Regions:
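Phosphate-binding site recognition
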Residues: 1-157
Length: 157
């Protein structure tokens, strides 16, 4: 859909099509176990080059409601999980690479302002009838979208 909102499955598809792919969809089952609980805020930290981007591409493809990704996941480990169908393609996904914002700004305040502006613009493109013109609060924009769609957000940073 957008740059950040519901990014689809292209990134994960590229990983699947690579000469070397290791199925890490077991991570999805771990996330599914907490997605509807108070423990839903998860931090997966790893050193550089440990596959964080591939993991976020995979999670975005799995949860993104704007595209049916059954064809990508049906043959992978996650398809055997009890929760596979329940959560697949059921959320609005915001996927963000914070390094993108850090590299284009000179201060934390500027970075946060640019980040918020870009996220709101993407929400407005995706849901023009639900995000008010001139909205400058990301939290309110997301609440407005949720109030109309009842589709929860998964945020991947």
């Amino acid at each position: 859909m957008g740059s950040y909102l519901n990014p689809g499955c292209k990134g994960f598809e590229e990983s699947l099509n690579s000469a070397i792919y290791v199925d890490k969809t077991g991570l999805i089952e771990k996330v599914n176990a907490v997605v509807d609980t108070r423990q839903k805020y998860i931090c997966v930290s790893r050193p550089r080059r440990f596959g964080k981007s591939m993991a976020t591409d995979m999670l975005a493809a799995y949860y993104d409601q704007s595209v049916d990704t059954a064809r990508l996941f049906d043959t992978l480990q996650i398809a055997k999980a009890e929760t596979y169908q329940k959560y697949r393609n059921q959320y609005d996904v915001l996927k963000v690479n914070m390094q993108e914002f850090l590299s284009m700004t000179h201060s934390m305040d500027e970075m946060l302002a640019v980040f918020q502006k870009r996220m709101i613009a993407d929400l407005k493109r995706g849901y023009p009838d639900y995000v008010m013109d001139g909205e400058d609060s990301l939290v309110f924009a997301m609440k407005d979208v949720y109030a109309h769609t009842k589709c929860p957000f998964i945020i991947l940073i």
